[in-house]
Amino acid sequence: MATINQLVRQPRKRVVEKSDVPALQNCPQRRGVCTRVYTTTPKKPNSALRKVCRVRLTNGYEVASYIGGEGHNLQEHSVVLIRGGRVRDLPGVRYHTVRGSLDTSGVKDRKQGRSKYGAKRPK
C-alpha cells in the first residue's frame, strides 16, 4: 500500500482498456470496399473453406472480414458494411460483414435466425 506522500508525488496509473476492434474507432460499424475476396482454411481441429474478404475502410484501415452464411455475392469492388466480432478459428479475422446491407445480399432461403443474415420473412 502506498503512503499518502507517495500518492501526492506520483498518482495512481489509470488502467487503459485495449479495444478488440481498433479499425472501427469506437463506431458500431464501418463502410469499406472489398479489395480481395477469397477462401481460407481454419486452425487445427476444424476443417472447411471459410469465406473472407479484405476490406479497405473509409478511415484508411485495411482489415480481413468474415462473410457469414451460405453463399454470397461479393466481388472485388463491392461496398460492404463491417461490424466487430472475431472468428475464433481464423487468425487475424476480427470483423464480420453485415449481410443484407449495401452491396451484400442476404442469405437465400434462410428460415431461422434471419435477422443475423439479412433475410426477409418468407411468404
Swiss-Prot record:
Molecular-function annotations in GO? rRNA binding; structural constituent of ribosome; tRNA binding
Tell me the InterPro entries matching this sequence.
NA-bd_OB-fold, Ribosomal_uS12, Ribosomal_uS12_bac
Renumbered residue ranges of the record's region Disordered: 101-123
Q: Please give the Pfam families that the UniProt record associates with this protein.
A: Ribosom_S12_S23
Which residues are recorded as modified (3-methylthioaspartic acid)? D89
Q: Which UniProt keywords apply?
A: Methylation, Ribonucleoprotein, Ribosomal protein, RNA-binding, rRNA-binding, tRNA-binding
The processes (GO biological process) annotated in the record are: translation
Q: Where is the composition biased (Basic residues)?
A: 113-123
Q: What PROSITE patterns does UniProt report for this protein, alphabetically? A: RIBOSOMAL_S12
The terms describing its cellular component in GO are: small ribosomal subunit
HAMAP family, per the entry: Ribosomal_uS12_B
Role noted for this protein: With S4 and S5 plays an important role in translational accuracy.
Family per similarity comment: Belongs to the universal ribosomal protein uS12 family.
How the protein assembles, per its UniProt entry?
A: Part of the 30S ribosomal subunit. Contacts proteins S8 and S17. May interact with IF1 in the 30S initiation complex.
Question: What name appears for this protein in its UniProt entry?
Answer: Small ribosomal subunit protein uS12
Report which gene this protein is encoded by: rpsL
